[in-house]
Amino acid sequence: MSSPRLRPGVAAVIVVVVVACFLPALGSDFVLWDDDMNFTDNPSYRGLSPSHLGWMLTTFHGGHWQPLSWMTLGLDYSVWGMNPLGYHLTNILLHAVNALLVYRLIAALVPGVGAGAAAVGALLFAIHPLRVESVAWATERRDVLSGLFFLLTVLAYVRYARARDAGRPGGIAFGASVACFALSLLAKAWGVTLPLVLLVLDVYPLRRFSRRALLEKVPYALLAAGAAVLAQLASNLVPAKRTLGQHDLVQRAAQAAYGLVFYLWKTVVPTNLSPIYLLELTLRPTALRYVACALLVAAITVAVVVVRRRAPWAAAAWSCYVLVLATVLGFLQTGPQIVADRYSYLACLPWVVLVAAVLGRPAAMAVAVAALAVLGVLTVRQTRVWHDSRSLWEHTVRIDPDNYVAYLNRGTVRQYEGDLVGAFGDYTDAVRRNPEYFHAWYSRATERLALGDNAGAAADYTTTLQIDPWYVEALNNRGLARQATNDLEGAAVDFEEALRLAPPSWPPRGMIEANLLGVRNTLARRGQ
């Protein structure tokens, strides 16, 4: 039986529903959650001149190598300037295209699936609240863009495999698949396990696993290896990366099991979604939630192995799910998060394919359509959470009152708004919940400096430097606080150390040199 074509009317319905659910994002601002680092404070991406393109191709900015994503953002800037509407519009349109590609993927992988079932499956993917982070957050352009080429890679590969099975060459489809994979990796390197996913598809549903099928994966594997090296080099620049001494293999395995269960659970019950789910400062693998998740993952794995001959679809779906998530489960932990909604963007595709496969029955279709209505409402609500920095971090504090990152960011928002007392309270809440969180100590110190509490500021900067002795800005600011309290010798020491640590080409060096010169001149006049 032939697969259903994507007719214009069906495509239009899918696009309209997707755009409608994410429409609130068009009124959203850039948020204080990497958007500042990537857009408002980053002139390097603003344009497509040779110098801009050179930066995009070589930078590891923010711990990522994503030149193609930067190019699309540079194009957005060329059209929209710093108006966030254009950036959000591009994300939404890319996501809508991905929904159409998911329809095509379902049609390609599920024999005899109806157009209605494929459309519902595509919408279950597209308007699920777990997608909001990838779509409504301008920084995550890399998700929707790399996802587009990831889907095209798989679709072209399936076309190639079908052609080979029918005795046709299929070389163009194979070349297109490899090229799309390269583009996906240029947008974001999270697809490095795709060669293994294609091998799973060779086993089921394509049923063409062979030595030749293995050899076909060589170009994919070479691209994946190159991207993995670049991704690792980029992530090495992220200060929040945890070493094995800080987060051992047993702890990472527990985190991985938790992640595998988390995305399944949130797919079924997508409530209390957050921009940051904090990894404990010290993860205890014997804690009930980690033991329970490990047992559940083991049980699912054993079950799909036992029924692999009778239900090969179960083993294929579980394998693809695990493989797509493998790079973000914590084995190479970067950042303070234990899980993240955005990591589910591609990983949950196997489940929507399976759901679409059983929607031939009217009762199942009715349940799925009802679920779409609920998911659509939840997605609209979750998109509004990302409207601005204040709403984002108010929401996060509300659902997780111990989230020290949320307190820091809400405090920064309050500081920008002129609410210095509120900001000080948030910074204090952050350091109470994580005494090692030097960013919060630094922010509270800076707030104290602004409020004229120079002694308190110097004390908080000292705590910051005890945690991170190489924090140049903290050294300079402690020097200013000490200077204000007439501790000129201490101020001079701080300015000298800041200059020793600061890179030669760092723009603020001139300011620190001026601070040091001023202190030295004052000391000289006093004869000290």
Model-identified regions with their sequence ranges:
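Polytopic membrane enzymes that build or remodel cell-surface glycoconjugates and lipids
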Residues: 1-425, 429-439, 443, 477
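Canonical positions in the second alpha-helix
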Residues: 396, 429-430, 463-464, 497-498
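Helix-start (N-cap) detector for alpha-helical repeat units in TPR-like alpha-solenoids
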Residues: 404-405, 438-439, 472-473, 506-510
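Register position in tetratricopeptide repeats
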Residues: 416, 450, 484, 515-518, ...
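TPR/TPR-like (Sel1-like) alpha-helical repeat modules
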Residues: 488-504
